[in-house]
Every structure is written in C-alpha cells, then in structure tokens.
Design a protein with these regions (language model features):
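Basic- and aromatic-enriched surface patches that contact anionic nucleotides/nucleic acids
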Residues: 6-7, 18, 54-195
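N-terminal extension/subdomain marker
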Residues: 1-42
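A short, surface-exposed helix-loop junction/capping segment
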Residues: 44-53
C-alpha cells in the first residue's frame, strides 16, 4: 500500500464545506473587557434558514456562575470558547465585526454578568460583587486569558447556517454522553461528602 497523503485524507472528508472552513480558522486569545468593547457579540446565533437560534437560552444556576468566577480567580483552566468572526470583507480593518458564539455562551454570559454586578460570589459568608473588588481583583476578571478557536466568515464567502450547525455539533455533541445513572451516582457522592 502506498503512503496516504494529507491531500488524500482531506478528500475523504464528506463535508467539503467543513474542509473549507477548517482552512479559515485559528486559535487566539482575548481578554473579556477588550472582547466586549471591540466586537458586536451575538450570543444567540440566529439561523435565518431555519428561523431558529443555534444557542439555548442562558440556563446556568447561581452556583455554576459563582464556580466559574472562582475558577478564574484561582487560575483554573477554562475550556476554550468557539466563535465565528464575521466581517463584510477581508480587506476593511475599520469595519464592525460580529463574533457569533458557537461554544461558551453560558461561560461568556456569566463573565459579563459578573462584570455588570448582576450576581455576587461569596467570600467569608459575605456577598461580593465585581464593584466591591479592588483594582487587582477586577483586573483578574477583566484581563484573564480567554482562549478561543475562531472560524472566519466574510460576506463574499460566508459560513452557512448548515455549517454553523455542524461546527456546533462537533464541539457540543461529538463525544459519548455520560450515562444518567453514572452522573447521578457521582453527584450522590458529593451530596454525602457535604453532609
């Protein structure tokens, strides 16, 4: 058997459009405060073809939100975000850019909500909002390293609604989901240990 080349492997990919998309992507880092100020952020990603939003509504509990903020303070790894960077043209650097969130809506919404003082974390039994933090602590949230996989889309070569769905499914449903019984069993251990 002859060697298999990268070109040959790419030809086996049945989703030709995804090969095109994958060649127009990159890994970058953002800081929440700059990300929020520099881009139009599309949290819902409306799929015009289907009259439906790609993203579910915000569903995280207060505890989940607080845990994410603590994770940032503690320097724990945060999973990468996935965005589609959409601009009308590759050539115009001064235009408005929209960042569509493909993966990470709950996390990014939580970060923005904390920055807007919409919920507190608990420190020594006291509620602590973003406004209550000193400059260094606020800096930790405003400028934490938000790693992201970014797919680039332009009016002359846009990422289609179908392609957005395929990318979303890749990041959200590609693995084997945990069995409910296994998940409940693990949660039961936590319930026992906190009593």
């Amino acid at each position: 058997m002859s060697q298999i080349t990268l070109r040959k492997l790419e030809s086996f990919n049945t989703l030709t459009s995804l090969r095109r998309i994958d060649k127009s992507q990159g890994t970058v880092s953002f800081e929440p405060i700059r990300f929020r100020n520099w881009y139009n952020v599309d949290m819902d990603v409306y799929l015009e073809k289907y009259d439906y939003n790609l993203q579910r509504p915000f569903v995280w509990t207060l505890l989940q939100q607080q845990e994410l903020i603590w994770s940032i303070f503690m320097g724990r790894p945060i999973p990468p975000f996935v965005f589609i960077h959409h601009a009308s043209s590759r050539m115009n650097d001064n235009e408005s850019v929209t960042m569509q969130i493909i993966d990470g809506k709950q996390r990014l919404t939580t970060i923005f909500r904390y920055m807007d003082n919409e919920f507190p974390i608990i420190v020594d039994g006291e509620e602590v909002f973003f406004k209550d933090l000193d400059r260094m602590a606020q800096h930790r949230i405003n400028f934490f390293d938000m790693r992201a996989q970014v797919y680039y889309s332009y009016n002359e070569e846009p990422i289609t609604d179908d392609e957005k769905i395929v990318i979303f499914n890749h990041y959200n449903f590609a693995g084997t989901p945990q069995e409910e019984e296994h998940k409940n069993r693990l949660y039961s251990f936590l319930d026992v240990s906190t009593k």
